[in-house]
Amino acid sequence: LSTLKAAKNMRIKLLNYQRTFYSDALKEASQSKQKSIVFGNSKDPATAYRLAEILNRHKIQVHSLAKNSTVKGKRYAKEASYVVPLNQKKSKLIHAMFDTQTKFKDSLFYDISAWTFPLSFNVNYSFEKSIALAGSEIKTLAIADDKAIEQSSYAYLLEGHGYYTPKFLYTLLDAGIRIKVGLKPFSIEGNSYDYGSLMIPVSNQNMNSEMLHKKITEAASGLMLTIRSESTGLTEGIDLGSRNFETIKKPSVAVLVGDGVRSYDAGEIWHLMDTQYEIPVTKIDVRQLNRIDLNRYTHLIIPSYSGSLLNSSTKKIESWIKTGGSLVAYRDAIKWVNKSELAKVKLKSFKREATGISFDQKDNYRGAQNIGGAIFNTDIDRSHPINFGIEQSTLPIFRNSRIFMEADKQSYNNPIRYTKNPLLSGYISKEQINLLKGSVPFKHIRKGRGNIILLTDNTNFRAYWYGTNKVFANTLFYANFMR
């Protein structure tokens, strides 16, 4: 009631503010040197489309890219990129979505401190001083018609960059179709294929070539993937029949839920698999784990977890891993993995030694050490299976935890590593960023015939962090190739 009363008393002031907000925004935009934003990439139209979809939902004017372009060393394909003019009434909202901020008046936050959308989608973007790159305005945003896939007598090929590659891959695996992944780049008939490209051979399938073509075409519908038909296995680089192609097994995934498991993290994993990838997932309550036959599953995911209920299942989980299972542990679950001695991980610790902080400032000091949610840059090794399908050599990562894993002495065991100056957007204290520099958000540990995969950061945050969803998907399909 007090809020309504205050609004009534401020009625004229609020109405004036509402009336002038957009006109002031237009005036400010017209005077700015920044005239447009180009965003997108060269090989993943789906991710750029989903970002354009959000802009369109908020009635922000979006244009197509006039032609294939290279801007500041980054490639933008016409069919996978967009241009947003800044001289429009919602320019303030556009800036709120695309700007980065690393300096703040306060160090305490109610929620996360960074929302930068192009970083969360991991698309290239640039503020431009003209609208020269803009094509026609997109009045009705729609997914482009599927590209025709010619029937092949030898094999079908596609790169792994597309956002919906995991969905396509699982659909075919579920139909019993044999698929291989390329561990090294290669070229064939003038087309280059990156690490993690997929090959679907026509021979040795459980169906004839006509049915295989039909299944592939149906599975790819609406996913914005480029699939090519090849008639030969002779390539520049690795041959299609070489040992540098590994057969992918269909994952069977379980995720822990219940007491001790952070429900937000579990829900985000479930949402991603169910809504985006359409991969079935079994939710297992922590209290019921000892009654479950884990041999039914290839993967067990432990979202951020704290507590002691899992302790009674340690030997069961360890035995399952040793016989070929893959355990994926997120955030605080890493501490449980350490404590249970499933694996030994060196963690950096923060020594809280306050200097010059008075008693009445201690709460603010402690609060400032939290990482409520910020965006950080990493260098990645694109040849490692955890990074298959990621186009750039850097990857923005969302972090809202204070778990810092030491890098391995062997560089090839650090395929994702925080840079020397990692902060891209948001707040982090000097003490915490010193711990973050050079640490690693990912570790793969062999155990018997199985795998333990550790991730300090949430790759699926609030269903809009598209850029690192692929890291999670790669743990499902490529864990055995990380050994």
Where are these regions (language model features)?
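Intrinsic-disorder/low-complexity accessory segments
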Residues: 1-483
